[in-house]
Amino acid sequence: MAIGVTQNTFQLNIVSAEGPLFSGKAHALAISGLDGELGIRPGHSPLLSRIKPGVAYFQTDLKGDDEILYISGGILEVQPSLVTVLADTAMHGKDIDEARANEARRAAEENINKQGNDINFAQAQMDLAKAMAQLRAVELTQKQRRR
């Protein structure tokens, strides 16, 4: 490949502890890194980042909708033509139980608001972030289906 010339896709592999979720060509990936949102396109500079709980979007077709995933955290490795997401947990938005995510959000908020030293505040915040990310993935998937 000549310097300055990039392909229009990269190989994207998304794997969670439960198994592979996606392996194929992608045009773009947006994911929540520890220091902020990351946008990955073909030819991106090498990068290694921790992933925080959030929604990941990736585009496999320039004309189609984004694929939407909930990612609970993990590691992102980027090479110019290969991107690997090693997720602790990952789910397609359509596979998330909205009622369970709402209950997890409510329980986390309740734990944060409790007075006393018997709660782990950092863990409660992490639980809340995960529940909110799941609900966001559900919301975005539902909006996409309505179009």
Curated annotation (Swiss-Prot):
Predominant cellular place of this UniProt entry's protein: membrane
Phylogenetic placement of the source organism: Bacteria, Pseudomonadati, Pseudomonadota, Gammaproteobacteria, Vibrionales
The keyword Cell inner membrane appears for this protein: yes
Lipid bilayer topology: Peripheral membrane protein
Transmembrane regions: none
Function: Produces ATP from ADP in the presence of a proton gradient across the membrane.
UniProt gene name: atpC2
Listed GO CC annotations: plasma membrane; proton-transporting ATP synthase complex
Keywords tagged on the record: ATP synthesis, Cell inner membrane, Cell membrane, CF(1), Hydrogen ion transport, Ion transport, Membrane, Transport
Protein name: ATP synthase epsilon chain 2
Keyword tRNA-binding: no
